[in-house]
Amino acid sequence: AQYGLLGSIYAKSALGLEKPRVAVLNIGEEEGKGNVQAKATYDLMKADTRFNFVGNVEASYIFTDKIADVVVADAFVGNSLLKMGEALYRINHRLGGKIPSLRKMLRPLLGRIIPKLYWQQDFWDAMNAESIGGVQVMGVNAPVMIGHGSSSPRAICSMILSMERDIKSNFPEHLRQALKEA
């Protein structure tokens, strides 16, 4: 449940979402779905009233805003999804940005996991490690970000811009306040 709270606070502070929808990544949307860990996470998050928990979300919806703004997953699954997104970006880049060709190629493999969003540049920028730069570690005293060891100058610049956004949004203070109320 703590990751749901952290994600919700970050989405409010840094991304400007008024009431972010938080969900657990699972194999189905129904409450009883998933393994023991997913079911326990669901129960903990459902009981936590500090954020807007909307239930489970299937992987086919994580690249859309139809169900959730914040998706909570274990480290193995979350990192696997991150790597998949990076791979999709590299495939599209190698094809020269020929997104319709990529869509035609991937459709039989991934079904509907890649939505209409697929044509939009913002979607591809979000998959590009160079555009994002790194990942927020949710520092309580100050924003902390981790990047790849092989980060390029562009990725480092993107990381600095992300840190600037996090500092201007006063994210650490919002996080401290929420944790005091816990």
Predicted regions and their residues:
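Glycine-rich phosphate/diphosphate-binding loop of Rossmann-like nucleotide-binding domains
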Residues: A1-A59, D69
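Glycine-rich oxoanion-binding loops at beta->alpha junctions
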Residues: N56-D65, N128-A129
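Glycine-rich phosphate/nucleotide-binding loop
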Residues: I67-V71, A75-A182
